[in-house]
Amino acid sequence: MFSHKFICGSLTKMTETGITFDPPVYEQRYCATIQILEDARWKDQIKKVVEFGCAEMRFFQLMRRIETIEHIGLVDIDKSLLMRNLTSVNPLVSDYIRSRASPLKVQILQGNVADSSEELRDTDAVIAIELIEHVYDDVLAKIPVNIFGFMQPKLVVFSTPNSDFNVIFTRFNPLLPNGFRHEDHKFEWSRDEFKNWCLGIVEKYPNYMFSLTGVGNPPKEYESVGPVSQIAIFVRKDMLEMQLVNPLVSKPNIDKESIPYKLIHTVEYPFYVDTRTEKEKLWTEVQIELQRFKRQFESSEIEEGTYQDTCNMPIAFLLDRLEHVGATKERIEELLLENNLTVENECVLIVSSDQESEWSDPYKFSDRSSQDDALVDQEQEEERWDQGPES
């Protein structure tokens, strides 16, 4: 067995009238799944991720921020749902201004989680958040065959409701007529039932190990019921530096009864490969800080009605601004002298606007300059997403 501990904090509060989770359970599920994908034991080896049951593609908005992921497949059987939400995967304006350091291809696919299809080959990680409880037994039986037999990913994450927790929910509201939390649920498993399902998978596919966890902690004095949502993490043994029991099949056959997936939408994100040396990167940052200091100096001159041909920027000030990129006093002074700038009395001499030299516009030397601050508000405005699915 292996373990995984979440760093997401949460608070569960139960009163006489109800129970609340902060943050909401759906956000806790997303946070937990992102942390699983970013686990240092396998993060760098997860390049292609497939999410089954992607629905409104809310989880994608978080997953796309993982720079090591280069291919995301979003799969759902509901074509109309995919069509209504397909534009949500398109790059934002900020993605063009501050592009990724690696490529990202996104495909929206209509298909059944039980069907094997060419688009699923070479998948490194599979995500199925609150999916399995929505399928009938015949589909449920085929899911392990498709994922662990055909896809053979390095990492698989399933989440599903924990029926043990329903004893708390029913203190305040009855379950739905079907006996579950949601009208489309076909079943809700206890922790033992979920564990038995997982044990059956690793017995049939011994190349995998699993760990059980969950989100949505129970209130105090009810710890015995477990979390609202239970999570199974399956990891292929070679990701844990263990020997595989069986060799991987190089190109598994597609089930003849499977219906091929239909590609609904595809998009490729802009990316920028920075080929500059560390020295060139630091020089660009130095130029940006010199330009910023000069503009501030000239603005103060205009306000005071005084004009000078030069201004002096303290090396200490420059160092303070650039320590976060690994700058040292020696490296800064070396760069300044190499680029014919004058250093006197622990200051660099900056010429006025009418005497500008070629270093005056650092942006023409770099397409990827420091623009983070200017983008924060824009990204927040573009990436707001509303309340998610039920807990």
UniProtKB/Swiss-Prot annotation:
Q: One MF term from GO for this chain?
A: small RNA 2'-O-methyltransferase activity
Q: What is the lineage of its organism?
A: Eukaryota, Metazoa, Ecdysozoa, Arthropoda, Hexapoda
Query: What is its biological role?
Result: Methyltransferase that adds a 2'-O-methyl group at the 3'-end of selected small RNAs. Mediates 2'-O-methylation of piRNAs, single-stranded siRNAs and long hairpin RNA genes (hpRNAs). Methylation protects the 3'-end of small RNAs from tailing and trimming and could constitute a recognition signal for appropriate argonaute machineries.
Q: Which organism is it from?
A: Drosophila melanogaster
Which cofactors are named for this entry? Mg(2+)
GO cellular component terms given for this protein:
cytoplasm; nucleus
Catalysed reaction(s) here are: small RNA 3'-end nucleotide + S-adenosyl-L-methionine = small RNA 3'-end 2'-O-methylnucleotide + S-adenosyl-L-homocysteine + H(+)
What family does this belong to? Answer: Belongs to the methyltransferase superfamily. HEN1 family.
Compositional bias of kind Acidic residues: 374-384
User: Where does this protein hold S-adenosyl-L-methionine?
Assistant: D76
Positions of the region Disordered? 354-391
Q: What is this protein called?
A: Small RNA 2'-O-methyltransferase
User: InterPro entries, alphabetically?
Assistant: Hen1, SAM-dependent_MTases_sf
The reply on keyword Endoplasmic reticulum is no
A Gene Ontology biological process annotation?
Answer: piRNA processing
Provide the transmembrane region boundaries: none
The cofactor note reads: Binds 1 Mg(2+) ion per subunit.
- Which enzyme class? transferase
Q: Where does Mg(2+) bind?
A: E130, E133, H134, H185
Q: What is its EC number?
A: 2.1.1.386
Give UniProt keywords alphabetically. Answer: Magnesium, Metal-binding, Methyltransferase, RNA-binding, RNA-mediated gene silencing, S-adenosyl-L-methionine, Transferase
